[in-house]
Amino acid sequence: MDITFIRHGHAEHLLNYPKELNRLHPGLTEQGKKQIVSLRKNINIMPHDTIVVSPTKRTLETVELLMTNEHNGAVISPLVGPRMYPQDPKFAPLGCDQIYSMAELSLLYPDKQYIDVGLEAWEESINQMNTQQFTRLAEQLLAWCRKQTGHTFIVSHDGTITNYRMMLVEHDLTRDDFLGEAGYYTVRDV
């Protein structure tokens, strides 16, 4: 199975950096929307492919712009929500990285499906989970992905994507290895 990680486009919390980092649920900017529309030329999502998306406004908007009408839709998982990289318990989570609750998602995106990963990942989020707990839950998500058909696309955040890349194939990554706005990276034969 191959996984392509996609980083969301430019979002509202970066407009007045760093003053807007505690903004709740920032969406994509016009620039971010254009980045994702441009990304569609490089990403070919087929109807049978699996899309897993972080429960944040900017990633859900990214998926809406990436998907074609033929695709069945994306599934939401807190296991691809924002996660700090590198991990440091001294840093407080930022407001922009707060995920939607299941109640909020059911109101805002009633047609979306969820991957059942247990309540702990929704309530605690993966942002500051210790490495062992994150790895255990991430392995469960990857096992679920392996059972799906087609290619898997994960629409997420720089820190989260880097944590998964470290877990899967790469080591010694730094913030310099972040994909950046609307960036993507494919891991083969997961």
Where do the model's predicted regions map?
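Generic beta-sheet signal
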Residues: I3, Q148-D158
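Short, well-ordered beta-to-alpha junction loops that form the rim of enzyme active sites
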Residues: G9, V53-K57, P78-L79, L119, ...
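Phosphate-handling substructures
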Residues: N22-G27, E70-L137
